Amino acid sequence: AHILQKAEELHRLMGESPYEFIRTGETSFAPLWNRPVRGRDTFYRFYTYHDLHLLCCRLKDIYDTYDCMEDAMAAAGPCEDPILRLQQLFADLNGIPVLHGTSACKRLAMFLRWMVRTDGIVDLGIWRTAVHPRQLIIPLDTHVHQISLRLGLTGQKPATLRTAREITDALAKVFPDDPCLGDFAL
C-alpha cells in the first residue's frame, strides 16, 4: 500500500506525463527538493527525495541526448550486457548497484525484463530493438534462488549476479530465445 501512495505522490508531482516533467528541466524538479521535510528526507525505504531529484536530473541528461531510454541503451552498438549498459547510464546514483559487488542486480534485471519482454500480462515490451529477450538475466530473489538450488539450476550459495547468470544459463537450455520465461515457473 505504501508503494501505491508513493506512486500517487509522483503522479501529483509529475502530472500526466512524467516524460515531459523530466524534459522540462530543473525548474520542474523544485518540488522534489524544496518540499518541507518532516524528520527524514525519505521518499521510499532508503531512497530520499534528493536521490529522486538526482535520478530526474540524470534522466533529463539522457533525454537531452536521446529521444528515449532505448536509444540510449542502443547508442554504443550491439548490447552484449544490458545490465552493465544500464548501470553505466545511471552510475553513481543511489539505488543503482555496482556490478563488482555482491548484488544480484534484481531491480535492474526486473526493469529490463519489463521493458524488453512482451507477455501481455506483466511485461510491457516497450523496447523492440536495443535488447533481445535472450540477453536478459533472471531477476533473482530469495525464492527463485532457493528453488533453483533445489532443482540444481545453480550451485552458488550467495544470491549474486553470478548466481543469476548461472540460473539464466540453465533456463536458456529450455528457453533459448527467452530464458526469463522460466522465471514464472520458478
Predicted regions: what they are:
Residues 1-186:
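HhH-family (HhH-GPD) DNA N-glycosylase catalytic core used in base-excision repair
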